[in-house]
Amino acid sequence: MSRSRINGNFIDKTFSIVANILLRIIPTTSGEKEAFAYYRDGMSAQSEGNYAEALQNYYEAMRLEIDPYDRSYILYNIGLIHTRNGEHTKALEYYFRALERNPFLPQAFNNMAVICHYRGEQAIRQGDSEIAEAWFDQAAEYWKQALALTPGNYIEAQNWLKITGRFE
């Protein structure tokens, strides 16, 4: 039984129902349908905190999915899991890969900025202000890209950019 069928979460059930209806009415190949089923099950596992299972489903979806746009969201979600697990280098890699396929993912730019900002704060705690500034500058660049895509979002980031003199 697929995860989406055993998940008790209302939103996940609603998503699964709508997704199943769309899969029936939109002309897609069996491979695309199978890829989406793995993606859907990965999202379900991820929402329950079952990250290892989510990753298995996402990797299988990546194996089957051919559309670059759809692949970008799979890669983005893999990045989210690595971020959650504190594997920031891996997370950045997956966000980059997602953006290569879909440069209009402001949430990926935002998450990359958050990681860079965090690393900047770590460098400050370690007494390395030069490295910290480099990380903060990189965070600023990513936040600017996120804001360029969605000007009304990421207010805290926008304020940080203004306060630190990095807003242009």
From Swiss-Prot:
> Is tRNA-binding set as a keyword in this record?
no
- Provide the membrane topology annotation: Peripheral membrane protein
Asked if the record carries the keyword Thylakoid, the reply is: yes
Keywords assigned:
Chloroplast, Membrane, Photosynthesis, Plastid, Repeat, Thylakoid, TPR repeat
Where can this protein be found?
Plastid, Chloroplast thylakoid membrane
Listed GO CC annotations: chloroplast thylakoid membrane
Q: Which function does this protein serve?
A: Essential for the assembly of the photosystem I (PSI) complex. May act as a chaperone-like factor to guide the assembly of the PSI subunits.
What is this protein identified as?
Answer: Photosystem I assembly protein Ycf3
Q: Which organism is it from?
A: Morus indica
Q: Which gene encodes it?
A: ycf3
